[in-house]
Swiss-Prot record:
One of its GO terms (molecular function) is DNA-binding transcription factor activity. Belongs to the transcriptional regulatory Rex family. NCBIfam families: PRK05472.1-3, PRK05472.1-5, PRK05472.2-3, PRK05472.2-4, PRK05472.2-5. The lineage of its organism: Bacteria, Bacillati, Bacillota, Bacilli, Bacillales. Residues 16-55 bind DNA. Pfam families: CoA_binding, Put_DNA-bind_N. It comes from Bacillus anthracis. One of its GO terms (biological process) is response to redox state. SUPFAM superfamilies: NAD(P)-binding Rossmann-fold domains, Winged helix' DNA-binding domain. It is found in: Cytoplasm. SMART domains: CoA_binding. This is Redox-sensing transcriptional repressor Rex. The keyword Repressor applies. Keywords: Cytoplasm, DNA-binding, NAD, Repressor, Transcription, Transcription regulation. Modulates transcription in response to changes in cellular NADH/NAD(+) redox state.
Amino acid sequence: MEQQKIPQATAKRLPLYYRFIQNLSLSGKQRVSSAELSEAVKVDSATIRRDFSYFGALGKKGYGYNVNYLLSFFRETLDQDDITRVALIGVGNLGTAFLHYNFTKNNNTKIEMAFDVSEEKVGTEIGGIPVYHLDELEERLSSDIQVAILTVPATVAQSVADRLAETNVHGILNFTPARLNVSDNIRIHHIDLAVELQTLVYFLKNYPQ
């Protein structure tokens, strides 16, 4: 299987499939059809079959998909046996919420440390996660932390990203409105909640169901 030939849109849907398949396995279900998957994850059946076709024969016509096989396959494909260690920068309201949540439903993803400049927060633990001063960023980030979550003010987002580029971080989940410029070896996913909300409102007004 050549991962580079899988469309990015398909890759983004894989965790969604995996989560639903996990729930099916926990409920004791042995097999599932593409129609059942479609109803659960709100992706049309043709798209699901096309997504799955990139990985070869995952199911049988007239039978559907074996739940345990899919679970094992996607677990390996998504590297669920490898721990992803994450650093969070910016312990405001959103950052604090992340620390309390800490991906409790994803056993392979864990925020290990956080950074801020607030004297009230530095030196404390939030959700069991230590908060260090931002000045200690390069010193504290260990080589096994390759992902960072940015929840800092937009005005400092680029400078923080520049510093992260000098570490072993290769992925940034950016929750600030700033559009960051980084080297090609760092992948950034931008999540602007205000833009998402505006988009939702636009669709509600212009594409009524």
